[in-house]
Amino acid sequence: MRKNRIIMTHGINVNAPLLASYVNGNYNVELYADGTKIRFGNVDEFKPDFPENIDVCITRKCDGGCPYCYEGCTINGSHGLLLDGNGELINWMQSLHPGTELALNGNSLDHPDLERALILLREKGVFVNMTINQMHLAPNFAKLLDWQRKGLIWGLGVSLVDSESDVFYTCIKHFKNVVIHTIAGIITVEDLINLQSIKPKVLVLGYKNIGRARNYSLNHADEIMHNIEELKVNLPMFIANEYFSGVCFDNLAIDQLDVKNLLFKNNEEGWNQFYMGDDGSHTMYIDAVEDRYAKNSCMSKEERYNINDKTVDEMFKHIRDTYVNDSETSPEVSEVSSDESKS
């Protein structure tokens, strides 16, 4: 869930407009229009009171049929609750803090209450990043563009399916703050070479061996491992030659690709600036369909907890108390992430 990307120290000029500036616990956060986020503070360790980013599954209804879908979405899947009986945001959404980023995953476009919820979230100062499957981009092009222009969605994540689609490239150039979502083990080197023509931001997600992805990995284990090894070989070259305007990873991809040794070998300072922290330290996951929350979307059923009437602060405190150890980020290092929606 966590995205880690190219580093920027606080004080360096950021050309993009400042979207939000807020205090979270004992440190400050600045969020910029290009997806850059900077944390800074004169403290021994950063201790947030609320999550900066929340991955949210609002529906499991999707006609994409991806064989490696970790959420197990189907055409007959259920929607999560977003609004109460009065057409207002449900309790946990009401408790969100201004500046918080929500990453809506799955085929969120199919949710009947989505637009109303987006309007209310915008009024609260919450930034919504939406991830969609590439197959849903062209059919919903006008709607998505209108929502972004109105500020209902901030970032758009597009899960890559076909890197040779002319329609995809025609549509994508009209959006700002777009991140192309790829999956380690699924994405090929050829796909990344094709993407280079538009020089996008690219998010590499780890392969989540849950949901339908578990069965897919059993039948395609060699292919998945081959793609991961090929990515390891070529990733340093892609970054050094600036194939993309930015490359970021979630923590699972960092482990699977051994990013620390691959890109930061003998560069502990660079790694400390790059790494945004463990899942649960500044982030969490909410399953609005099942009304449960967890450290991240990979957690087992036993490690997903009922929301009931909890606020986001209460859920996040539980996550941190349960999973986060005493080792936090050095206050002398400002951290940057590029957050769009997570898949």
Question: What is each stretch, according to the model?
Answer:
Residues 36, 67, 291-292:
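Residue-level signal for well-ordered, solvent-exposed loop/turn and beta-edge residues enriched
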Residues 152-310, 315:
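Radical SAM enzyme [4Fe-4S]-AdoMet core and its adjacent flexible, acidic
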Residues 1-56, 73, 268-271, 331-341:
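N-terminal [4Fe-4S]-dependent radical SAM core
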Residues 65, 105, 289-290:
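Residue-level recognition of short loop/turn positions
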Residues 296-343:
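Membrane-interface junctions of multi-pass transporters
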Residues 44-85, 297:
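Canonical Radical SAM [4Fe-4S] cluster-binding loop centered on the CxxxCxxC motif
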Residues 53, 72-84, 97-111, 121-140, ...:
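Core AdoMet radical
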Residues 88-91, 113-123, 143, 167-170, ...:
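Alpha-helical scaffolding segments of alpha/beta enzyme cores, especially the outer helices
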